[in-house]
Amino acid sequence: MSYKIDRNTYAQTFGPTTGDRVRLADTELFIEVEKDLTTYGDEVKFGGGKVIRDGMGQSQVRRADGAVDTVITNALIVDWWGIIKADVGIKDGMIFEIGKAGNPDIQDNVDIVIGASTEVIAGEGHILTAGSIDTHIHFICPQQIETALASGITTMLGGGTGPATGTNATTCTPGSFHISRMLQSAEAFPMNLGFFGKGNSTNETNLIDQVEAGACGLKLHEDWGTTPSTINSCLNVADKFDVQVCIHTDTLNEAGFVEDTINAIAGRTIHTFHTEGAGGGHAPDIIKICGEKNVLPSSTNPTRPYTRNTLEEHLDMLMVCHHLDSKIPEDIAFAESRIRRETIAAEDILHDMGAFSIIASDSQAMGRVGEVITRTFQTAHKMKVQRGPLSQDSDINDNYRVKRYISKVTINPAIAHGIDKHVGSIEKGKIADLALWKPSFFAVKPELVVKGGSIVWSQMGDANASIPTPGPVHGRPMFASFGQSLIKSSFTFLSKNSIDQNIPNKLGLQKKCIAVENTRNINKSHLKLNSKLPNISVDPQTYEVFSDGELLTCEPLDEVPMAQRYFLL
């Protein structure tokens, strides 16, 4: 006999289904479930008197015969490819299937077999996203990694050697010695890591040495001299060894202007950091480079979104990060040339248009490592409030906008750096790096983080309590953060050449090392939902930004969501 229940009761029991809408945190963003892959009346749920019991939702199938290791039940998946309700099966640390879980002996259309070997994570009423990827890391202190993990980041790419003066300013791990030591250090952390070598050298041998030592990319930074000749040399090596080049261009325009940099790049693929310019780059018009097809443009989070405090905080940040002296007028002028209200305001709109494709942190070097996802969706909220629904959306949901913005911190950085085969989205066959969120805490604090198929971080109450929930509840490392589980659950990204030369074994690395690939034959059109190529111009006197002749401007926000009410301590 069938039994009908109202939508509200169903959502409270099994989570929202097709047509239901969910508000994201305290923003004005609303998502609507596009499709439900579970089966009405045949849903699986764990608990006393519930479905996942032996002979009911749990089958007799052994692990060796197809039962999964873990199932996340009734989760609301938010990814670039859709917003759907589904069960997610995990096996051997990989995403095994997305669909309907259960017992095929008594249930129809079962994609994910639950057996005695299967653990359950209750996804009902929760949002599931891929673990996010931060591709602009200054590895200044190891404590960044825990902070990033607590925010839902599961992959960090960048450069540095610790709190050295060079690392405080630039995302470079220079030379084979430092690359080797950072790769060895990566063994200690429950995070996917990869390191950029220093790309500033006209002698290509210096760059080749770093790629062969294990660098997964090269970084050009103006503080080391980003001239047309170093740009050309760096890209030559990248093309030969299939690694990505990231660039922080010449703010002072000493070696040329933005047009000269574009000419030096010569149509080759490159990832431009803080493309608006406050983080550095040709003043005042580096922002126009986002209209080039071969450029993969990203932002860093201190300018995300534009608020009444954005300009004021930047000057001091910049002086510290780039080792400038407030007693020297030229240093002050250098700093002030990078901070422009007009280009920061335009950056908001360019993100909303899909012309800027990636958001990262710039950790401890003008950016906040634990706020990448939060600031991404604060920007989305601001644009919804100021610009209204996107043309692809309706008055009742913001699905396209949300998918556009989640892409900026998941799949697009993965594509840009040649790791999208492994991470960056919830798709069959990829590493099970996942973040589970209560909708009220979406993009602020994940309820738990799964790393390589094991729980690595979770909101957790008092360890001496009789149940897990009594306060104080806060994020804490879980078992996949320790011992050999850490080694098996996290990965290190290197150049293919270094893996071919057996660098992991020579350095005694235990983590699985994965080669980056397909970084040189991509362009902006490969980036998901963020591939617009506007014709950008900047007025050299007023700094006003125009896209295809239209002025791009917006007002700063006085108050953002996902802020004080979530961080009272």
From Swiss-Prot:
EC number: 3.5.1.5
Quaternary structure, from the entry: Heterotrimer of UreA (gamma), UreB (beta) and UreC (alpha) subunits. Three heterotrimers associate to form the active enzyme.
GO cellular-component term (any): cytoplasm
Catalysed conversion reaction: urea + 2 H2O + H(+) = hydrogencarbonate + 2 NH4(+)
Subcellular location: Cytoplasm
Root EC class: hydrolase
Keywords, sorted A to Z: Cytoplasm, Hydrolase, Metal-binding, Nickel
PTM description: Carboxylation allows a single lysine to coordinate two nickel ions.
Protein name in UniProt: Urease subunit alpha
Limits of the Urease domain: 131-569
Residues annotated as the enzyme's active site: H322
Pathway the protein acts in: Nitrogen metabolism; urea degradation; CO(2) and NH(3) from urea (urease route): step 1/1
Source organism (scientific name): Prochlorococcus marinus (strain MIT 9301)
Cofactor note: Binds 2 nickel ions per subunit.
One matching Pfam family: Amidohydro_1
Residues reported in the UniProt entry to bind substrate: H221
Residues that bear N6-carboxylysine: K219
Keyword Metal-binding listed: yes
Location (main, coarse): cytoplasm
Cofactor: Ni cation
Record GO terms (molecular function): nickel cation binding; urease activity
Positions annotated to bind Ni(2+) 1: H136, H138, K219, D362
Family: Belongs to the metallo-dependent hydrolases superfamily. Urease alpha subunit family.
Residues bound to Ni(2+) 2: K219, H248, H274
